Amino acid sequence: LLKFDAETTRLLEIAYQGAELTRRRQASFDALCPAPGETILDIGCGNGMLTAELARAVGSDGYVIGIDPSEDMTAAARERCSDYANLEFRAGAANSLPIEDESADKAVSVQVIEYIDDIDGALDDTLRCVKPGGRLVISDLHFGSLIWFSGEPDRMQKMLTSWNQHFVSGSLPERLPALIKARGNFVEDVLPFTMTDYQLKPDGLAIMMMHLMKQYAVANDHVEPAVAQSWFDEQHSLAKVGRFFFSMTQFIVVVHKKG
């Protein structure tokens, strides 16, 4: 799995403030429909950007709890959200949440469940924390939707094969509705959010993935450093001549808990 250390946190911080990932975050926010006075869980809260937005939305009568297993991420989140009195951060994973039963009106997770070995446990524990009739929004990338041009397709495939080892489930969205319904809950909607980049935006998803993929492939001895660097450099070269192209879709599953 990818290690969310201080350097990774810094890379994510830049991209998460960019327009593309801000729109992605907004799509999950809109699907959740936070309302004044609600208690909301932000599961896998990362650096706290969505947590802060939720805290503003629920107001002083509401409360938001951000949960993440990474100390570096929660440190960044606490710093970002230090002015908010209606939120807190707790250490924990999606399949063992430090939350009381049926204590939250709503819960959201953005690109979290795909990294969990125990997907069934994560779904069960998240649903446990939400009140009957509450809403759960789960947003994950489908890595099968990835389109990424390269003039060296074999090298690109090596990098993608390496990257495919950093998550547990790259196809979770196609299975998630059935898993939800099997538990007696209702799927209100599945909303696609496609991110397309033909310029190699400095603050986009593609450039963030390029840095992380190069780092991950070399650190895990999946490819030689020179190969990873050549792949990285090619994408910049393609962008300079107008040939860069990247696209991937995230799916937002909106769940209504039974009861």
Name each model feature, range by range.
Residues 1-15, 188-244:
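C-terminal helical/coil "lid" or tail adjacent to the Rossmann-like core of SAM-dependent
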Residues 95-106:
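A short acidic, Gly/Pro-enriched loop at the edge of an enzyme's catalytic core
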Residues 183-185, 250-259:
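Core SAM-dependent methyltransferase catalytic element
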Residues 106-118:
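A short SAM/SAH-binding and catalytic strip from SAM-dependent methyltransferases
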Residues 120-135:
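A short glycine-rich, Lys/Arg-flanked "PGG" loop and its adjoining helix->strand segment in the class I
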Residues 137-201:
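Conserved catalytic/acceptor-binding region of the Class I
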